Amino acid sequence: MLATGALSLVGKRAISTSVCLRGGHGVAKVEEYTLPAYFDRRENPLPDICYVQALSPEQQSLKEKEKGSWAALSNEEKIALYRISFKQSFAEMNKGSSEWKSVVGGMLFFIGFTGLVVLWQRKYVYGAVPHTFDPEYKAKELQRMLDMRINPVEGFSAHWDYENKQWKK
């Protein structure tokens, strides 16, 4: 008795949820976004549903012809049957798109715009280059470091010949 009740409950639930959902006050239909969707992908060559859901009368007669011998079908009918089930063929899926051109164009545009912003900042935002970047100042700084004998063991002053006043060879 308990098993019969459980089976009838499961059966009622399966029937009621397959077509529509029953709410407290009426019948709620299944929304379209909850149903399986059609996607053409190389990784999943057989989608869950057919591409064309609502068949025209010609397509319905073609589906009836499909149940018979395929030798009786012409090539155009076979292609039409294929297009009912699939939107694209593998050749069409594998065909490259020209989307890369717009991506590269967008990247080059933003790189160019960034370059213009950097040039504008150098001219109008930043001040003059400090005097410490001048080659004359750098030469004086180098001579001062050598005179102070900075890091004489392994570093800078170790490569300077103090007797001949030139770099060691």
Swiss-Prot record:
Its main location: mitochondrion. Residues 1-22 form a transit peptide. One of its GO terms (cellular component) is respiratory chain complex IV. GO terms for biological process: mitochondrial electron transport, cytochrome c to oxygen. Pathway: Energy metabolism; oxidative phosphorylation. It comes from the Eukaryota. The chain crosses the membrane at residues 99-124. Residues 125-169 are mitochondrial intermembrane. InterPro entries: Cyt_c_oxidase_su4, Cyt_c_oxidase_su4_fam, Cyt_c_oxidase_su4_sf. Keywords: Membrane, Mitochondrion, Mitochondrion inner membrane, Transit peptide, Transmembrane, Transmembrane helix. Component of the cytochrome c oxidase, the last enzyme in the mitochondrial electron transport chain which drives oxidative phosphorylation. The respiratory chain contains 3 multisubunit complexes succinate dehydrogenase (complex II, CII), ubiquinol-cytochrome c oxidoreductase (cytochrome b-c1 complex, complex III, CIII) and cytochrome c oxidase (complex IV, CIV), that cooperate to transfer electrons derived from NADH and succinate to molecular oxygen, creating an electrochemical gradient over the inner membrane that drives transmembrane transport and the ATP synthase. Component of the cytochrome c oxidase (complex IV, CIV), a multisubunit enzyme composed of 14 subunits. The complex is composed of a catalytic core of 3 subunits MT-CO1, MT-CO2 and MT-CO3, encoded in the mitochondrial DNA, and 11 supernumerary subunits COX4I, COX5A, COX5B, COX6A, COX6B, COX6C, COX7A, COX7B, COX7C, COX8 and NDUFA4, which are encoded in the nuclear genome. Belongs to the cytochrome c oxidase IV family. This is Cytochrome c oxidase subunit 4 isoform 1, mitochondrial. It comes from Thunnus obesus.
